């Protein structure tokens, strides 16, 4: 029998067998919180190491570094739709899979494997800003508030039933890295609360008519439109950090505006 842990409110809850799937620094607080809450993280899945920076040296994802420091088994498959990947994922016998900015859409076999489903921590107030870059686009579009959503993952991207949400204001001069740092810790707390209350939560369906989208960023997004208002340009400077950044001319390679 699993030993109970205590939530911040003092309520005991049973630990779970969890597969964690995430990649960037913003996913680390959620994994850290799962360990602090006493859950059994049976595997950590993340993206493969990639070349970056000067000299294109290979860099590992932040989640991989954290997981290895804590003795957790790490998987970095280049493809997840193979029979081998599906069989490995199912073999864990997980209660839940937790996904935080993993960077890939899970196949149906993955969604069916955990006993209690796959839970996503998404950095917006769904159904607003579905997609890969919600914090960036919230700032660029001049939103004054955003938040974090926990949800069950379904077949459609970021459209699954909502479990819990937490709203926060966006600072007038806040950049995307600053906002994401806050949201990552809000997300960790919300994930902890979600798992502790999972037996008592009623998932709420999203309404497609209310959905807005946060598409994947490209370098072209950072090109400043000098016909825009000063306020719009200022939001782009804050919102397109740390990439693609705001730059003044299509041929700009070194001049970056922060």
Give the role of each language-model region.
Residues 208-258:
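Internal anion-binding site segments
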Residues 47, 51-95:
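N-terminal glycine-/serine-/threonine-rich beta1-alpha1-beta2 phosphate-ribose binding loop
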Residues 2-5, 10-13:
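Short, low-complexity intrinsically disordered segments enriched in A/P/G/S/L with frequent Arg
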Residues 28, 32-36, 86-90, 108, ...:
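Amphipathic, non-transmembrane alpha-helical secondary structure
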Residues 17, 42-43, 73-92, 105-123:
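Internal alpha/beta domain cores that form substrate/cofactor-binding pockets in large enzymes
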Residues 37, 47, 96-213:
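Donor/substrate-binding cores of folate-linked one-carbon enzymes
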Residues 15-54:
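N-terminal Rossmann-like dinucleotide-binding module
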């Amino acid at each position: 029998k699993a030993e109970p842990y205590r939530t911040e409110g003092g309520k005991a809850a049973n630990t779970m067998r969890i597969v964690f799937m995430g990649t960037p620094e913003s996913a680390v607080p959620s994994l850290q919180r799962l360990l602090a809450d006493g859950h059994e993280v049976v595997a950590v899945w993340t993206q493969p190491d990639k070349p970056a920076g000067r000299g294109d040296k290979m860099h590992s994802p932040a989640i991989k570094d954290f997981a290895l420091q804590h003795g957790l088994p790490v998987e970095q498959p280049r493809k997840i739709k193979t029979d081998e990947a599906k069989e490995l994922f199912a073999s864990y016998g997980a209660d839940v899979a937790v996904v935080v900015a993993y960077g890939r859409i899970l196949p149906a076999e993955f969604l069916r494997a955990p006993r209690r489903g796959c839970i996503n921590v998404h950095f917006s107030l769904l159904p607003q800003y579905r997609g890969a870059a919600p914090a960036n686009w919230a700032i660029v579009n001049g939103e004054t508030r955003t938040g974090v959503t926990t949800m069950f993952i379904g077949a459609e991207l970021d459209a699954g039933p909502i479990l819990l949400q937490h709203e926060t204001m966006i600072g007038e001069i806040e950049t995307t890295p600053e906002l994401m740092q806050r949201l990552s810790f809000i997300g960790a707390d919300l994930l902890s609360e979600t798992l502790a209350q999972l037996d008592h939560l009623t998932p709420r369906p999203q309404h497609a008519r209310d959905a807005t989208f946060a598409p994947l960023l490209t370098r072209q997004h950072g090109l400043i439109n000098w016909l825009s208002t000063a306020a719009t340009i200022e939001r782009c400077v804050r919102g397109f950090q740390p990439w693609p950044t705001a730059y003044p001319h299509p041929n700009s390679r070194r001049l970056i505006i922060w």
